[in-house]
Amino acid sequence: MKKIVFTGGGSAGHVTPNLAIIPYLKEDNWDISYIGSHQGIEKTIIEKEDIPYYSIASGKLRRYFDLKNIKDPFLVMKGVMDAYVRIRKLKPDVIFSKGGFVSVPVVIGGWLNRVPVLLHESDMTPGLANKIALRFASKIFVTFEEAAKHLPKEKVIYTGSPVREEVLKGNREKALAFLGFSRKKPVITIMGGSLGAKKINETVREALPELLRKYQIVHLCGKGNLDDSLQNKEGYRQFEYVHGELPDILAITDFVISRAGSNAIFEFLTLQKPMLLIPLSKFASRGDQILNAESFERQGYASVLYEEDVTVNSLIKHVEELSHNNEAYKTALKKYNGKEAIQTIIHHISEA
């Protein structure tokens, strides 16, 4: 039986692509383990998957000054020792890393044990963790073809993003019942990430009188962002977040308004949903969402509305453009084959 260790954490985006791959390896009888941090979100997610989870010390890697920068390098070194010992005991055939600060000690620990390391980078440009990990890895899978120019050619394999199978199995009838919607109007699903997006939430609610004339709205507004005055608004359903219902909601969705995090937008792409992307500004991020969104716009998958340009009028105008050019977006979206991502990654895992 072949063995694999997965790693990646710090945010859900560094975990969910692993969840897309793991079921296929289980079918092939791989022995699967996961190494992550003591308190990270990856621990909560993976322990639900009936996979052995091992914790190591970890320190965050920062590009900016913080007093924790004095302590965290020592935590990283402790993490490398923890990972080295754990990997020596597990004796995996390969390590698959999805990035995030906890992955660096695992990658180095694997390299010290002479275990092949495969990385996956979701964004157009590599994050700091993958930049460090790359020198210890044999291959790096990239989600965007354009990412290859930022990485060593001999290590790069373009795959796209692995998407969880359950996301693709939504039921429209269940969504209609859950939401209380009709079949008469198209559905727009709006999401701003797990914490929501204040400007998007406010603008959407201001635009509701106009939007609800033509559309039904599902608004995933983030924790603490519900508006009680709109709870009984016909054609409008708001949630802090949803879990098991999301595939059904996406099945009934005609258009998506979203941030431009890589994992989410590739789920929409695989489901062939035309998108209006409102990326995080450079003031709130390293600019990766802007690059992601612009790539999707160039390929005809999405329209982009920059956060600083978001108003009620601009939002309505972009939604109307999305609706008017729906067929053109659909034609472009059909060219992408999302299933190839998982197949390609599993092939290289098996060959490592």
Swiss-Prot record:
Gene: murG2
Pfam family, one: Glyco_tran_28_C
Native organism: Bacillus thuringiensis subsp. konkukian (strain 97-27)
One Gene Ontology term of the molecular function aspect: undecaprenyldiphospho-muramoylpentapeptide beta-N-acetylglucosaminyltransferase activity
Catalytic activity, EC: 2.4.1.227
Protein name per UniProt: UDP-N-acetylglucosamine--N-acetylmuramyl-(pentapeptide) pyrophosphoryl-undecaprenol N-acetylglucosamine transferase 2
Record Gene3D superfamilies: Glycogen Phosphorylase B
Single GO cellular component term: plasma membrane
Lineage top rank: taxon: Bacteria
Membrane spanning stretches: none
Example GO BP: peptidoglycan biosynthetic process
Record-annotated disulphide pairs: none
Subcellular location: Cell membrane
Positions annotated to bind UDP-N-acetyl-alpha-D-glucosamine: S11, A12, G13, R164, S194, Q289
Function noted in UniProt: Cell wall formation. Catalyzes the transfer of a GlcNAc subunit on undecaprenyl-pyrophosphoryl-MurNAc-pentapeptide (lipid intermediate I) to form undecaprenyl-pyrophosphoryl-MurNAc-(pentapeptide)GlcNAc (lipid intermediate II).
Family per similarity comment: Belongs to the glycosyltransferase 28 family. MurG subfamily.
Membrane topology classification: Peripheral membrane protein
